[in-house]
Amino acid sequence: MTDIDPILARLLRDLRASRVTLRQDLPGDYAFPVTHEALADGVSSLLRERTVDLRNQPVVRELLQGRQVVQPDCVAAFDDPAFQRMLETYGGLSAQIVTPVFVGEGLAAILSLHELGAPRGWTERDAAACTQAAARLGAFL
């Protein structure tokens, strides 16, 4: 267990999510692989998933602009075919909060909170909890 893992586990527990992932900008052919995750019971891991090219995802374009993405209904969020394929690949991703983790001027990591199975209304408090967790994670990167 690293210093990162308790932050993800707490976010999973406090917000009662299905999955929390941290994707880091690491050298290599795959952009932003999942390096850490916390999972609810019965939820599949994304640690070895390498079929979704994040460079083509509309959410990442928002993150690069420094914006957090809050989606209560992912299916309705973007018509983009690559985005829709990602939802299925990620186990029926239905709602998410995706928060950039910047170190200096660069996007160093992506913190994602996932809800599987059904849309979910997120609160400002939920989004703020993700922003606070991202700030804590930035200290370890």
Label each region the model flagged:
Residues M1-I4, N56, R125-D126:
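The cytosolic transmitter module of two-component sensor histidine kinases
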Residues I7-L26, H36, L87-E88:
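Short regulatory alpha-helical segment in sensory/regulatory domains of signaling proteins that mediates
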Residues A17, P58, Q96, A108:
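Short coil/loop residues immediately preceding or within conserved phosphate-binding loops
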Residues T21-N56:
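GAF sensory/regulatory domain recognition
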Residues V101-E115:
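Sensory-domain boundary capping and coupling elements
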Residues E115-A133, F140-L141:
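Regulatory loop-to-helix N-cap segments in sensory/regulatory domains
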